């Protein structure tokens, strides 16, 4: 199985993104393809290889958590890959996990293709099985965790520019799947922050 694809964004459309790796273009169906931009130097897309008799699709996600949620949703009776992808695209992982654990069907029916019956099935099939996706399960690494030195430096620069820890953390999460220089991280983060404000 392919764990992830790291490469340049060659093409983006409403349904998929093409990542070029060593001269080969991987067509990856993603929840929000327009998150990626053509010309991005290096991105990491966490993949799920979906194989059935009649189709073979490579699905891609910005984080391992998104991918884990997608695979859990595939196990729900009545939700296929399209439905799972739409839910991941429309929702926040933390809010969705909370809604399932607390059986908030009114929240779940807001997703495309999810009615009362499917919402009930989601809580029935997934309640108690999403511990690894719950926010308090994730190891608390702090804002400037080890791992990506360039991204951490960019976060420090944003803090020095006066952005709040909350804003910086949000941007850091959005950029974790990308491999950029410190300057490129800062530029990309500022673009994201200016769009939010």
UniProtKB/Swiss-Prot annotation:
Protein's UniProt keywords contain RNA-binding: no
Region Domain II, residue ranges: 63-141
Superkingdom of origin: Bacteria
Region annotation Domain III: where it falls in the sequence: 146-197
KW Chaperone (keyword) present: no
MF (Gene Ontology): ATP binding; four-way junction DNA binding; four-way junction helicase activity
Keywords: Cytoplasm, DNA damage, DNA recombination, DNA repair, DNA-binding
Xref: InterPro entries: DNA_helicase_Holl-junc_RuvA_I, NA-bd_OB-fold, RuvA, RuvA_2-like, RuvA_C, RuvA_C_sf
Region (Flexible linker): 141-145
Subunit structure: Homotetramer. Forms an RuvA(8)-RuvB(12)-Holliday junction (HJ) complex. HJ DNA is sandwiched between 2 RuvA tetramers; dsDNA enters through RuvA and exits via RuvB. An RuvB hexamer assembles on each DNA strand where it exits the tetramer. Each RuvB hexamer is contacted by two RuvA subunits (via domain III) on 2 adjacent RuvB subunits; this complex drives branch migration. In the full resolvosome a probable DNA-RuvA(4)-RuvB(12)-RuvC(2) complex forms which resolves the HJ.
NCBIfam families named in the record: ruvA (TIGR00084)
Protein name: Holliday junction branch migration complex subunit RuvA
Biological classification of the source: Bacteria, Bacillati, Bacillota, Bacilli, Bacillales
Gene name as annotated: ruvA
